[in-house]
From Swiss-Prot:
Catalyzes the attachment of glutamate to tRNA(Glu) in a two-step reaction: glutamate is first activated by ATP to form Glu-AMP and then transferred to the acceptor end of tRNA(Glu). This is Glutamate--tRNA ligase 1. Transmembrane segments: none annotated. It comes from Parvibaculum lavamentivorans (strain DS-1 / DSM 13023 / NCIMB 13966). It holds the Pfam family Anticodon_2. One of its GO terms (biological process) is glutamyl-tRNA aminoacylation. It is found in: Cytoplasm. It catalyses: tRNA(Glu) + L-glutamate + ATP = L-glutamyl-tRNA(Glu) + AMP + diphosphate. Monomer.
Length: 449
């Protein structure tokens, strides 16, 4: 397939995006970016009972947060005429036929087939109906749903992830494309959009493989050629269960992760490498991530998303962030204490918002922990005059060691507790010049400063 690729991310605005949806969007975006192609956002909103403008707006907000800006946009609810035209062609060609069974009748058929050891495949009884039969059923108040008549053949395609794939049409029921109330199900609008927008590559989860075999038949029935397909492994939760919009929104929705303070590029970095043999590496640029992206490296086995892994990558991303990148966000938090402050604290950040906590350690008020007042008094007396720099800590602690005889942990931990009120934190050689002599002396004296 020649020319620049066109890919699409096609969410249904019936709920919030979770990390599995984000992975689908990211793969399509990175593939387009790497190959100088177009990334399309398509709202699959034909389910007007469950689709809402609020969910649609939330999807766009989530993608913007991730940095995944679309080049093309479509909304299926605006394209019903195109789907009607495609359905009319399929009806005229005898590929779309009316069926009148109720859900209960179909369920009884399936149970009888399974009881006889047969696969629960629709028996095409509707194809045997005469015009008189159909008229009688409609007079009874029944409205037809419309099924696509599959060719009972093996549909083969070369998948960029799975390799050679075949879907046996004889093992499938003829899919329903139009409901009794005239609304379109997912399949036909998706096919028509892929044709009309010249989508070259469909990149989606492996749960769509069977559906792809069906869609290829519909595409060809409409006189078009199918795109290239890539079906990657599915992303499960940490317990190994598939993610869902309904059940996992509180834990794994993009909104929840954003509200928790995770960096968008940390999530992008993790999702881009999960399911590949490559180590996850923190990355602060989508261009850099796209340059590394190789769709052939995606695996076939389902994988798990663990928030603990995201926390590790988030920390690593913050460690890579320059002061110039951090400066406006520090200012927004009210804790821009300068480049030296940022360089001192960033090795200890898990979330960016932690910077505000370390600013309070520097500026106070800090409630010091004084376990040995005599030691603290000796340390205060040994404080050198300002100005201070990174060498001050070593000079001061040498003086305290000489004055008290303390060394190792017995020397350093009481100083940390007195200066910060904490048992851990950034290196004190970097924090001490930021705290300054006045605050350091006060804290060593047991004062909350």
């Amino acid at each position: 397939m020649s020319g620049a690729p066109v890919v699409r991310f096609a969410p249904s605005p019936t709920g919030s995006l979770h990390v599995g949806n984000a992975r689908a969007a990211l793969f399509n975006f990175l593939f387009a970016r790497k190959n100088s192609g177009k990334f399309m956002l398509r709202m699959d909103d034909t389910d007007d009972e469950r689709s809402t403008v609020e969910f649609a707006a939330g999807i766009e907000e989530d993608l913007t947060w991730l940095g995944l800006r679309h080049d093309l946009f479509a909304r299926q609810s605006d394209r019903l005429a195109a789907y009607e035209a495609a359905a009319a062609k399929l009806k005229a060609d005898g590929r779309l036929y009316p069926a009148y069974e109720t859900a209960a009748e179909l369920d009884r058929k399936r149970k009888r087939q399974m009881a006889r050891g047969l696969p629960p495949v629709y028996d095409r009884a509707a194809l045997a109906l005469t015009d008189e039969d159909r008229a009688k059923l409609e007079a009874e108040g029944r409205k037809p749903h419309w099924r696509f008549r599959l060719d009972r053949v093996h549909t083969a395609f070369d998948d960029l992830v799975q390799g050679a794939v075949e879907v046996d049409g004889a093992s499938l029921s003829d899919p329903v494309l139009i409901r009794e109330d005239g609304r379109f199900l997912y399949t036909l609008p998706s096919v028509v959009d892929d044709i009309d927008f010249a989508v070259t590559h469909v990149i989606r989860g492996s749960d769509h493989i069977t559906n792809t075999g069906v869609q290829i038949q519909i595409i060809r029935a409409l006189g078009a050629e199918p795109p290239v397909y890539a079906h990657y492994s599915l992303l499960n939760g940490p317990e190994g269960k598939p993610l869902s919009k309904r059940d996992d929104a509180a834990r794994f929705s993009l909104r929840a992760l954003r509200d928790a303070g995770f960096e968008p590029m940390a999530l992008n970095s993790l999702l881009a490498r999960l399911g590949t043999p490559d180590a996850v590496e923190p990355c602060l640029s989508l261009d850099e991530l796209a340059a590394r992206f190789d769709i052939s490296r995606l695996g076939r086995a389902d994988i798990r998303f663990d928030p603990a892994d995201l926390a590790k990558v988030n920390t690593a991303c913050l460690h890579l962030m320059s002061y110039e990148e951090a400066k406006p966000r520090l200012a927004a938090l009210g804790c821009d204490l300068g480049e030296a402050f940022w360089e001192a604290i960033k090795p200890n950040l898990i979330l960016f918002s932690d910077a505000a906590d370390w600013a309070r350690v520097v500026e106070g008020p800090v409630e010091p922990v004084i376990e040995n007042p005599d030691f603290a008094a000796a340390a205060a007396a040994a404080l050198p005059p300002e100005p201070w720099d990174e060498s001050t800590w070593a000079l001061w602690t040498d003086a305290v060691k000489q004055a008290t005889g303390a060394k190792g942990k017995a020397l350093f931990m009481p100083l940390r507790l007195a200066l910060t009120g904490l048992t851990h934190g950034p290196e004190l050689k970097n924090l001490l010049p930021l705290i300054g002599r006045e605050r350091a002396s006060a804290r060593l004296g047991g004062l909350t400063r």
